[in-house]
Amino acid sequence: MPREDSRSQSPVSRPSGDRHYRDRSDPPKRKHNSDGASHQPYRKKVQLPKKEHQYPSVNELKKRIRDVKRLLNRVDLPADARIVQERALAGYENDLEEEEKRRERSKMIKKYHFVRFLDRKTASKDVKRLERREKEVSGSDLDSAAKEQKLAALAQKLRVARVNLNYTIYYPLAERYIALYADAKKKKEMVKDGNNDEDGDAGYTLVHANAADKPAMWHTVEKCMKDGTLELLRDGKLKNGESGAVTKEKSNVDKKKTSIRDSVQQKDTTKTSVKPQRREDKNAKDSRGFSSKNDSRHSRARQSSPDDNGDESDGGFFEM
């Protein structure tokens, strides 16, 4: 076959259905990066804008309060401007108090979060265990009298366990949490006897076993369960016994502070009263010293007077 005829032939020598065949006129499907080609830049992560702090700054509020107080101390401030600044001062002080309470509340939540979690876990297990036991007793073939007696005892225990659970959940978040359960190691006697509890909370025991030993908040939670005000108690919107105790402690502290101030004032008054006495004593000493000097002079003059009455004379005016 001549060479020219071979050039004029179509390059398509394979069926078009062959997927491995590619016409040279088509662009390549796979793009190979050459060594000199620049790589695409790395796509940066999209950073979302930070959420604005919705709570006011304590330092900013304190600064505003100081500025308003300085402004109110001015004598030439107009009456209408003074009224506006007094209202602004009351609002700033209220905002500052609320912000400090919120920060104290969040601090207490972080501090006692893990203790509350452990107590809630243990109390929920106790409730489930007693509920299972109650179902078993109710479905057992016991005498009616014995069954009622056991069910009554279980109902009492279940009520206490539910109060314990609500205590761990609805304890006021802004107050110091008092734990109900203590992490106690198993005694050696239990290990020797080989008593293996099915539950994992065998090492946790109730600190306040009797109702009399329980904290005052436990009885408050029990009362709130009847009234249906547990949410209000958790948010600190109810007045409970512990808050009253806190107010009493604060009042005692205030009384101590006032007594200290009174004692300091009394000391100052005594100091001021003692100083003039000392001055008077000094004056008295000076007067005594002056008088003693005069007395000494008079005594010397008296001692010298008999000598002057002698025969010798200096030749006076009336002397003959």
UniProtKB/Swiss-Prot annotation:
It comes from the Eukaryota. Residues 1-59, 241-320 are annotated as: Disordered. Residues 57-111, 145-166 form a coiled coil. It holds the Pfam family Efg1. It is found in: Nucleus, Nucleolus. Involved in rRNA processing. This is rRNA-processing protein efg1.
